[in-house]
Curated annotation (Swiss-Prot):
Residues the record lists as Cysteine amide modifications: C64
Superkingdom per UniProt: Eukaryota
MF terms (GO), sorted A to Z: toxin activity
Protein's UniProt name: Conotoxin ba5b
Signal peptide extent: 1-19
Disulfide bond entries: C54-C63, C55-C64
Localization per record: Secreted
Pfam families hit by this protein: Chi-conotoxin (PF16981)
Gene source species: Conus bayani (Bayan's cone)
Length: 71
């Protein structure tokens, strides 16, 4: 009677799945970037890229007055 619980315990300790970290589907989904997030951030990213190119080394762009204080 004692052999069965000992065998099950040893089997659980030796199994390959015991070495892998447990990661739920929810945790995996929360840590990955989704295409929806990129579509939300894309206009903001494009506006930042445009503002940086507008306020380049010449500082003659019309948007440069807004961003000179922040840089």
């Amino acid at each position: 009677m004692l052999c069965l619980p000992v065998f099950i315990t040893l089997l659980l300790l030796v199994s390959p799945s015991a070495a892998l970290p447990v990661e739920s589907e929810l945790q995996r989904d929360l840590t990955q970037d989704s295409p929806k997030d990129f579509r939300i951030r894309e206009p903001l990213l494009l506006s930042k890229m445009f503002d940086r190119s507008c306020c380049g080394s010449s500082n003659t762009g019309s948007c440069c007055g807004r961003y000179q204080r922040g840089s």
